[in-house]
């Protein structure tokens, strides 16, 4: 008996998929970086922040997905006053870039 109706889906390109749960204490963030195949972030707990270079900081709330395309420079982490638990899914490689400065990190956050 199948668990699907109308046919069965196929699994594609799953060998290099990475799924991580990252717990960021308040005030902790990544460096700027890119992913060769993009990155899907989902906040599980707390308040998270993310930013594409040159754009406004975006506040992440639990249950909201955030997609970064291939080669897009970005960072993500916790709010300065609240920790966060982030689920990240990506494949390919990560290129680590320069640190996010305090001035960049403390910039005005907006909700998309």
Predicted regions and their residues:
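A short, N-terminal "cap"/entry segment at the start of jelly-roll beta-barrel domains
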Residues: 1-18, 31, 95-112
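Conserved short histidine dyad/triad with adjacent acidic residue
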Residues: 18-35, 70
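Short, conserved beta-strand element in jelly-roll/cupin
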Residues: 23-25, 34-50, 89-92
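Ligand-binding pocket scaffold of soluble enzyme catalytic domains
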Residues: 28, 50, 84
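Short beta-strand His + acidic residue motifs that chelate non-heme Fe in jelly-roll/DSBH
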Residues: 32, 50-51, 68, 73-80
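Short acidic-glycine-tyrosine-enriched beta hairpin
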Residues: 54-71
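A short hydrophobic beta-strand segment most commonly corresponding to one strand
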Residues: 67, 82-99
């Amino acid at each position: 008996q199948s668990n699907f109706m109308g046919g069965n889906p196929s699994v594609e390109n799953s060998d290099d998929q990475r799924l991580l749960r990252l717990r960021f204490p308040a005030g902790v963030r990544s460096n700027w970086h890119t992913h060769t195949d993009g990155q899907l972030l989902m906040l599980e707990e707390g308040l998270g922040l993310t930013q594409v270079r040159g754009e406004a900081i975006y506040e992440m709330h639990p249950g909201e997905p955030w997609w970064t395309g291939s080669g897009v420079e970005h960072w993500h982490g916790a709010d300065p006053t609240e920790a966060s638990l982030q689920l990240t899914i990506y494949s390919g490689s990560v290129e680590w870039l320069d640190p996010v400065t305090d001035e960049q990190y403390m910039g005005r956050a907006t909700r998309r």
